[in-house]
Amino acid sequence: MKRLAHFLALAVYCWSCTENPIGVEVPDGSLSSPVAGAKLAARSDIYVVRHGGEEVFRVEALKWRNGHRGVVSVTYDAPWGINEVFSLATDAAIARDLRMDLEIVSSKLEHPQRFHIIERMQRELRPHGIGFFGHGHEHIHYDWYGFEAAYEAFRTNFELMREWGLEPKTYAYPHWAGKLYGTQAANRQAGFIAARGGLRRPESRSEYYICPDDTREPNNWYFMPSVIMGAKNGTDIPHHDALAPILQGALDAGAWVILTYHSIGNPEGWGYYPFAEFERDLDHIAANDFWSGNLDEVTAYIKERNALDIQIVRYFGVGTPKQFELTIGDGLDNALYDEPLTFEFNFNPELRVRWVHFDPPIGDESSFAIEEDRLQVELVPDERRYALVLERDSE
């Protein structure tokens, strides 16, 4: 079989929401490249591969992992390990295979007598999907102290988390600080890629929603809204029945919503929230079409998807090509942005593709059966080159 190798054209016609317009330059002369091309189709995360004017397949990076309708991140501002009452919540999340994130106030853990708590976190929590967010070196209102003090505290928090192997990426401001641009800038310069704030009694529950509908990123990565859970101390959502409409709205809008809890099952603690109500919240999340995602995971997913670039490098075969080589990347730091995206491949039904073989393999799998002309796989957009071999029914 004669082996043909052509560089394919990448012609880009894309639009997205007004918050994040995207434009890609087409190299000179590439529009006249022969017979094949990969181009963006209507949205910046769908790529269509054609040969001789016929669509072979299209690739879409789904908005949320595994095509879920919405996303929930459960964040817990509590000093896990200081008192066993704080394990109630993490045990409940782990029992339901749901993700959850915990605060790290580094001054509370930097003393040698508390190093065993960090060891327990690594051993008992991280393997079960419990993540960690920076919460300051001290638990103070950083808007009150200016840029320099905030930066020093954020950077110390970041560096200690990294030293302890907690892989810092995201942050949450104590006392609902972070409203000042200087505080946000300090957080960004300290190394965090996003930060959670708090939203007190919004006029509309839609203000809680991050990336609703076609919106591609938060209004402000360094002051993301969250739902303030709690039955006392002026907190907003005292029980599950008050939360349920907010969660339903997130599903309807295809949005991400962050929940902030304090003192779950601890009546003496600030912002007490009944444990039975927390269990109802978790059961509701598990029973509905939510991606239960850590702050780090969801943040990286959104940023990688927005920066996605798929290049069809070449193809092989006589007639309609059977093998394609493509690179999937995002141009971001792969040491920091290492979250798999969910890609959906849709094949032209007339081609009757039954198997797709990947080289290198995806995880431990190299061959995937095609059902109803569709395949979903999880890939990190780390600029790796993949060979895809299409096996058709007639072969």
Task: Go through the PLM ranges and name each one.
Residues 393-395:
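Short acidic/polar inter-strand loop motif in beta-rich domains
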Residues 70-72, 82, 93-185, 189-228, ...:
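Metal-dependent polysaccharide deacetylase catalytic core of the NodB/CE4 family, i.e.
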Residues 2-13:
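Sec-dependent signal peptide recognition
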Residues 1-2, 309:
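Short linear, low-complexity motifs centered on an aromatic residue
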Residues 32-83, 179-387:
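C-terminal active-site subregion of NodB/CE4 polysaccharide deacetylases
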Residues 21-35:
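Short, low-complexity, disordered segments immediately C-terminal to signal peptides
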Residues 87, 91, 152-155, 159, ...:
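Solvent-exposed, polar/charged alpha-helical surfaces in well-ordered, non-transmembrane soluble domains
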